[in-house]
């Protein structure tokens, strides 16, 4: 879910001017018809219909906001876990022997986050995967259906290599593994939001009834 910080008014106007023009023409037709052939429409049904529509639209807006808030929380969890992983790599691994591994883990996490961003937006992640990783290092992950998850698995293997080399102990490895689990859980939540959009009924019925209300409104006001 990509939301601009500042509304794009030109884009909004470009999307709504045609329906507004059609409604304006319809309002003129209803008004002219009323003066030529006077009629009286009851206002109570329209009032009840408008109240029900407001509740329906409010419920849909609440559902959409909850999804946005959950996505925001998941991305915040990803940021915090990435910082924790970077801090653990710099704190646990020795500065001399493990400097290259420190850098590799941090660069892999940077690559992972950007590849995940591309996957969620249905963009090709190859360019981001090769930005900080060598072709040989990125190749195993690029061959997988879920490239981001492949990169994360590779990070776990790097941590295990550090334990086998004696640079970290099993307790430190378990601590880093918990951070990787938090990262994987955040990714799973984001993919769930992406792959499970709001049902079509949430989109179709509010739009249909809103259009119907706009058509009936001038009839009830004249």
Annotate each PLM feature.
Residues 9, 13, 36, 140-144, ...:
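Solvent-exposed interaction patches of small proteins and small membrane subunits
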Residues 1-80, 95-99:
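N-terminal juxtamembrane/topogenic regions of multi-pass membrane proteins
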Residues 24, 53-56, 181, 209, ...:
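Residue-level signal for the membrane-embedded core of alpha-helical transmembrane segments
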Residues 1-6, 132-137, 204, 208:
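Conserved catalytic-core motifs characterized by acidic clusters
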Residues 88-202:
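Structured inter-helical modules in multipass membrane proteins
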Residues 62, 82-89:
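N-terminal alpha-helical signal peptides/signal-anchor transmembrane segments
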Residues 15-23, 191-222:
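Transmembrane alpha-helical segments and their cytosolic interface motifs
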